């Protein structure tokens, strides 16, 4: 017969040097542990069978008259083989179920990876859309700034146009005033020329009058001279000549004085008129030139204003287009964001469902590991009792498996004393956590002794916690509620610890807050902590359930009772499918349905040459005394061998009854 180490060396002949993942290593180690345990169980069963055969031979050699005893032994053997066949069937079904669960687990992991990839892609699309929205908003701000600048320039140009128009009106008034002054000066010039002509005519008239008077005077003098003596004629002529000469001289002086005065007045007025005309003409030319320049500037400003108005209209049209595009982008972004949020909610729900399923599978695996370790301890106890020496490799596998199981859970063992004074009772405490978060802030940690509750902001943005509530409840007890201050804000990536006043912590917000009105958050076996926002909606929750399992052991752990349940269907025991129990110490088969011992000669022998066996192990606990405890654990776990199974014929009826 091949030893377990030889079979393991035959199975482990795979390619060396290929790196294996931790999951694959764990699966291989679990497979080796199961194979090792099955090999040891096979050795143990072979040893039991050999001992039974030796006992039968000894009994036959001692006395031939103990046929009843031999029939009982053969009946026990037949019942054992039948139950072993049923156990193999059960092992096959459980192995298939385990393979199916492993396939479903791998499928769920693949779906989880795919959902994570899709979520990352959707988040990248969302970030791109947000970046594009920011760019469009920046472009809109720049366009608005350019529009405000153009409007300011337009207002400045309009002010300049108004100023230029006022200057043009002022210059036109000055031009009209200059024209009026020119007309007045021309009128004064004409008046002066008329006066000059009048003075010339008066002078000519005075000359004519003086000449007439002179002739009249000469005629009178001539007439008088005729009348005067001849003696005095010369005297009178000389006097007349002198008088005429004086009169002529006076008239000439007066005429010369009038002429000089008239010439001076006319020259001065003419010079003033010329200077005024020159000034008016120069002012009119300057005003006309300035008016032309003003007209040119007004035309250029009007053209520039029309161009600016066209640019403004184009900018306004472009701004309307940008606003419409921005509104469309915002609407698309809102729709995309809503779709992303809906998909994220669906993915969260699916992830939560997958995590729940994975948690169930993990609980099943932990329970399997625990029962494998229990099975190993029971088998080691029986090997020691039967003085079967296990291989060194199996001892190493048992130690490594025990280390893995001890590190897998968070259970604590404690000694308990019951009311009747029983000692040696061993308890195990297990904790189950359930957390859920639908926002940025989640419940990170709760203290079992009621000292604190810790919240953490796992996002990249600050979260305002004003008027938010933290509600703590133990089972059906009244809840304890803490309310945040109105202006409290939890920074991105930071945590806040809310201490009870009895914990002795220091109040240093925003990282540590002391609840002065409450000395403790409360403790118990079912603690539920929830975070509620200002709208009364629950955004985060963490539930912690503590379960204490009491195990009654003897002072020596190697004295545990072992029951091997062989699953089979009874057609004669009220149609029940409960297992029969095989007590390794008493070697008596008990029917799990009716509780009667098996008939040693009531079944045929089955094949016992299989290379591996498959059984279902359940562990019974007792507090004192020997024998099997009545309260066996309800769990049964299957261990399978690597060799080919040989099926025994199924019993048609209850072999015990």
Swiss-Prot record:
Pfam short name (any one): Filament
Name listed for the protein in its UniProt record: Lamin-A
Location of region: Linker 2: 218-241
Entries under Gene3D superfamilies matching the protein: 1.20.5.170, Lamin Tail domain (2.60.40.1260), Single helix bin (1.20.5.500), Vasodilator-stimulated phosphoprotein (1.20.5.1160)
Lipid-linked residues (S-farnesyl cysteine): 654
Compositional bias (Low complexity): 602-621
A GO CC term assigned to this protein in UniProt: nuclear lamina
Modified-residue entries (Cysteine methyl ester), positions: 654
Start-end of Basic and acidic residues biased regions: 415-428
Subcellular location: Nucleus lamina; Nucleus envelope; Nucleus, Nucleoplasm; Nucleus matrix
Location of the IF rod domain: 30-386
Region of interest (Head), ranges: 2-32
Modified residues (Phosphoserine): 21, 391
Any Gene Ontology biological process: heterochromatin formation
Family listed: Belongs to the intermediate filament family.
Region (Coil 2): 242-382
PANTHER family given in the database record: LAMIN DM0-RELATED, PRELAMIN-A_C
Biased composition (Polar residues): 395-404
Region named Linker 1: 70-79
PTM notes: Phosphorylation plays a key role in lamin organization, subcellular localization and nuclear envelope disintegration. Phosphorylation by CDK1 at Ser-21 at the onset of mitosis drives lamin disassembly and nuclear envelope breakdown.
Residues making up the propeptide: 655-657
Function recorded in the entry: Lamins are intermediate filament proteins that assemble into a filamentous meshwork, and which constitute the major components of the nuclear lamina, a fibrous layer on the nucleoplasmic side of the inner nuclear membrane. Lamins provide a framework for the nuclear envelope, bridging the nuclear envelope and chromatin, thereby playing an important role in nuclear assembly, chromatin organization, nuclear membrane and telomere dynamics.
Spans annotated as Disordered: 1-24, 383-442, 554-576, 601-621
Annotated stretches, region: Tail: 383-657
